Amino acid sequence: MIDLKQLRDDPDRVRESQRTRGEDPGLVDQLLQADQARREAISAADATRAEHKAYTKSMGKKMRDASPEEKENLRAKGTELSNVVKEKEEAQRVAEASVHDLQMQISNIVEGAPAGGEEDFVVVEKVGTPPQFDFEPKDHLELGESLGIIDMERGAKVSGSRFYFLKGAGALLQLGMLQLAAQKAVQHGFELMITPVIVNPESMSGTGFLGQHADEIYYLQEDNQYLVGTSEVALAGYHSKEIIDLSAGPKRYAGWSSCFRREAGSYGKDTRGILRVHQFDKVEMFSYCKPEDAAAEHQKLLSMEREMLAAVEVPYRIIDVAGGDLGSSAARKFDTEAWVPTQNTYRELTSTSNCTTFQARRLGIRYRDENNKTQIAATLNGTLATTRWLVAILENNQQADGSVKVPEALQPYVGQDVLKPVK
């Protein structure tokens, strides 16, 4: 959630951020009014409690010399004040709940992102040259089926649409890619974790995933829990309600998990193959740092994504995502998109987001500054490898005979340098 002090000090910036996102700037004024009402309710409750405390203290002396009738009046006055205290405290509770509800509706403040919507991104960099084939390239599913490594038909038979089996070298290719990502993360000082894939509502809400895109999440109604769409959720919740030590620099984790997404808003999109599926595997980086270090940490995560994409030998570009296409938690996000030959375009493989203090404020994650005062931490995340990378690896490394070259960095995991058709 956003910082109330920042909202009071610079409401125009928050309004502009809301407009940049295509969201309601009127929420800012509603929150300012609710915040003022909350502060007035707190003052009223404090004053009433003080009055009641003073009356209770003085009543003891008065009771010693009072007549029975006076004692009854004194007690009645005390009861009346006690009831007023309860009323004021309830008014304070309601006012605080109103502020909290409005805070939860306002997205993070955009920082440096281009204006506009989904198509208004800015290309930051292009790396590699899209391959020029002297044959008609096959898409990843046709390749996967001919190589005997992807089985969508049986995936649908067992689980429904957008499910699949990875077989043989396909399973090894994915596991090798994830293992390579895990090793690179560890080499760069990240602590590797295999995270839970079921989380509580506090963790899901705290990371900002129960807002506009809540319908994308699998909800386990009987248990009041959720399946994660990314290990970011579990890694963010890992230090919830804690004071963490950032004196030696950022605290970095890499989460390996299966991920689940309903793809509720994707009817008819990418129905062929494994580009958009309900279940996939991913290695996700997650950093906690001081707010002033967040921009530099964002670049570190992006550089690691560059390193992994270079290792799997696919042409890609980096885009600066426009404000109107940001998730509610992200102040800024860079996507890396790989070239997909049969679609003649770039498709997203990874993203890395700077969530500033938005998630940590919701989750109660703090650190101590140089003056030993507690401050809200910043959080960042970025994907280091995931299932959909297989799409780009297969298509960009295919050969005229239907075989696919295995990127050199993945050959030790797959045990082959070329995958050959089996049918």
From Swiss-Prot:
CDD domains xrefs: SerRS_core
Gene Ontology CC: one annotated term: cytoplasm
Annotated L-serine binding sites: 230-232, 284, 383
Chief location of this protein within or outside the cell: cytoplasm
A GO term for molecular function: serine-tRNA ligase activity
Catalytic activity: tRNA(Ser) + L-serine + ATP = L-seryl-tRNA(Ser) + AMP + diphosphate + H(+); tRNA(Sec) + L-serine + ATP = L-seryl-tRNA(Sec) + AMP + diphosphate + H(+)
Chain positions recorded as ATP binding sites: 261-263, 277, 348-351
Compartments, record wording: Cytoplasm
Keywords associated with the record: Aminoacyl-tRNA synthetase, ATP-binding, Cytoplasm, Ligase, Nucleotide-binding, Protein biosynthesis
Enzyme superclass (EC): ligase
Record-annotated disulphide pairs: none
Listed pathway(s): Aminoacyl-tRNA biosynthesis; selenocysteinyl-tRNA(Sec) biosynthesis; L-seryl-tRNA(Sec) from L-serine and tRNA(Sec): step 1/1
Regions of compositional bias (Basic and acidic residues) in chain numbering: 1-24, 62-71
Pfam family, any one: tRNA-synt_2b
GO biological process: selenocysteine biosynthetic process; seryl-tRNA aminoacylation
Region annotated Disordered, chain positions: 1-71
Family statement: Belongs to the class-II aminoacyl-tRNA synthetase family. Type-1 seryl-tRNA synthetase subfamily.
Domains (record comment): Consists of two distinct domains, a catalytic core and a N-terminal extension that is involved in tRNA binding.
Function (record text): Catalyzes the attachment of serine to tRNA(Ser). Is also able to aminoacylate tRNA(Sec) with serine, to form the misacylated tRNA L-seryl-tRNA(Sec), which will be further converted into selenocysteinyl-tRNA(Sec).
Assembly behavior: Homodimer. The tRNA molecule binds across the dimer.
Protein's UniProt name: Serine--tRNA ligase
Upper lineage: Bacteria, Bacillati, Actinomycetota, Actinomycetes, Mycobacteriales
